[in-house]
């Protein structure tokens, strides 16, 4: 006798910011005996190996933005081709529900599911709803949010909004209860610097110049771990080697980033939704530099959720100078109580069972519309 087990199609853009929470949901669904397939774009190759999907469907995708009408028209044509691919995949997989985590690669499969009357659930990770999710929200049965307050949700969809939190990766949950590292006069100062899943050149430009400005006694205690883009790596390492730091490790990518976050006294980073949620989960203070230039300013809104409770400093990139960063580092490292208080404040914003909450929502939505 064949036992039917439902399948959920999870859709996410191919970068860590979208894939990490999608991955966390996938693990939670599989723990309930629900099969998972993933629809995404070609960028997924570098991080797809850890995704617990029985099938990965690559969908043609593009972002219809910019001033060039030709480029925008080309993007629309690409999305149209992706819609055809997605519609065939949805018919073949016959999912009980389709869950979208944002980014334009989610538009073709989510729209295909809505037109084929398959229940859809949106998850918005940021404190400002993205344009792709805003477009899809009208046809979704449920809109789950990572933050309690989210700007930009279409008015007609607000009644279907449920705050679940952002799903946290198992590797983060594994270190979430790590106590804040002891910090006293003369002890090592552990600073972690990273720029998100794709790195950030500004960190390689500003942070070394700021470290040079620190008093020598602080530099001697500083143990620095920094993510640097491959093209910046050698120059960044060489600058640090001349500073007399207590320790330095730089690399383009750290697979064990959650463990390094748990070991840090302070984190300097961008403020993507996953980063902000993981800082809260582990309880680590941060200096956050929101990605500039975004029309919706979503990273600034994300950073504000921690800054408003005293868990982080949010510095616009235009004000993120070596002098400003050096001054903030001296202020925090010379007053350890500020760091421990910020660490405790960060934990007040965490939702460790967000993946289970979202999995329950997905299962209930699929059952209610089957």
UniProtKB/Swiss-Prot annotation:
It is a peripheral membrane protein. Its main location: membrane. Pathway: Cell wall biogenesis; peptidoglycan biosynthesis. One of its GO terms (cellular component) is plasma membrane. One of its GO terms (molecular function) is undecaprenyldiphospho-muramoylpentapeptide beta-N-acetylglucosaminyltransferase activity. CDD domains: GT28_MurG (cd03785). Keywords: Cell cycle, Cell division, Cell inner membrane, Cell membrane, Cell shape, Cell wall biogenesis/degradation, Glycosyltransferase, Membrane, Peptidoglycan synthesis, Transferase. GO terms for biological process: carbohydrate metabolic process; cell division; cell wall organization; lipid glycosylation; peptidoglycan biosynthetic process; regulation of cell shape. Gene3D superfamilies: Glycogen Phosphorylase B. It is an enzyme of class 2 (transferase). It catalyses: di-trans,octa-cis-undecaprenyl diphospho-N-acetyl-alpha-D-muramoyl-L-alanyl-D-glutamyl-meso-2,6-diaminopimeloyl-D-alanyl-D-alanine + UDP-N-acetyl-alpha-D-glucosamine = di-trans,octa-cis-undecaprenyl diphospho-[N-acetyl-alpha-D-glucosaminyl-(1->4)]-N-acetyl-alpha-D-muramoyl-L-alanyl-D-glutamyl-meso-2,6-diaminopimeloyl-D-alanyl-D-alanine + UDP + H(+). The keyword Nucleotidyltransferase does not apply. Pfam families: Glyco_tran_28_C, Glyco_transf_28. UDP-N-acetyl-alpha-D-glucosamine binds at residues 15-17, 126, 169, 197, 299. Its EC number is 2.4.1.227. It comes from the Bacteria. It is found in: Cell inner membrane. Cell wall formation. Catalyzes the transfer of a GlcNAc subunit on undecaprenyl-pyrophosphoryl-MurNAc-pentapeptide (lipid intermediate I) to form undecaprenyl-pyrophosphoryl-MurNAc-(pentapeptide)GlcNAc (lipid intermediate II). Belongs to the glycosyltransferase 28 family. MurG subfamily. HAMAP family: MurG. This is UDP-N-acetylglucosamine--N-acetylmuramyl-(pentapeptide) pyrophosphoryl-undecaprenol N-acetylglucosamine transferase.
């Amino acid at each position: 006798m064949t036992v039917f087990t439902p399948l959920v199609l999870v859709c996410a853009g191919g970068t860590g910011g979208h894939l990490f929470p999608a991955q966390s949901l996938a693990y939670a669904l599989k723990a309930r005996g629900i099969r998972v397939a993933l629809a995404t774009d070609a960028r997924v190759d570098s991080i797809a190996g850890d995704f617990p999907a029985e099938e990965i469907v690559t969908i043609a995708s593009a972002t219809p933005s910019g001033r060039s009408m030709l480029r925008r028209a080309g993007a629309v044509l690409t999305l149209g081709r992706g819609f055809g691919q997605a519609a065939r995949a949805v018919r073949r997989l016959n999912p009980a529900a389709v869950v979208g985590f944002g980014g334009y690669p989610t538009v073709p499969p989510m729209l295909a599911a809505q037109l084929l009357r398959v229940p859809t659930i949106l998850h918005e990770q940021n404190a400002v709803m993205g344009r792709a999710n805003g477009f899809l929200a009208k046809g979704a049965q449920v809109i789950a949010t990572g933050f309690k307050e989210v700007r930009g949700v279409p008015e007609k969809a607000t009644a279907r909004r449920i705050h679940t939190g952002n799903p946290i990766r198992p590797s983060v949950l594994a270190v979430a209860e790590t106590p804040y590292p002891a910090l006293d006069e003369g002890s090592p100062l552990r600073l972690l610097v990273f720029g998100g899943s794709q790195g950030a050149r500004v960190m390689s430009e500003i942070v070394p110049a700021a470290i040079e400005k620190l008093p020598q006694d602080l530099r001697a205690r500083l143990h620095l771990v920094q993510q640097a883009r491959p093209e910046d790596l050698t120059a960044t390492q060489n600058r640090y080697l001349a500073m007399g730091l207590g320790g330095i490790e730089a690399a383009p990518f750290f697979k064990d980033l959650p463990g390094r976050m748990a070991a840090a006294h302070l984190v300097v980073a961008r403020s993507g939704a996953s980063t902000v949620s993981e800082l809260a989960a582990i309880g680590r203070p941060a200096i956050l530099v929101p990605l500039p230039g975004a029309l919706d300013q979503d990273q600034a809104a994300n950073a504000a959720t921690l800054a408003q409770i005293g868990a982080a400093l949010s510095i616009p990139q235009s004000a993120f100078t070596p002098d400003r960063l050096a001054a903030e580092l001296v202020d925090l490292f010379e007053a350890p109580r500020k760091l421990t208080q910020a660490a405790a404040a960060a934990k007040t914003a965490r939702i460790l069972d967000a993946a289970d909450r979202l999995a329950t929502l997905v299962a209930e939505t699929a059952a209610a519309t089957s």
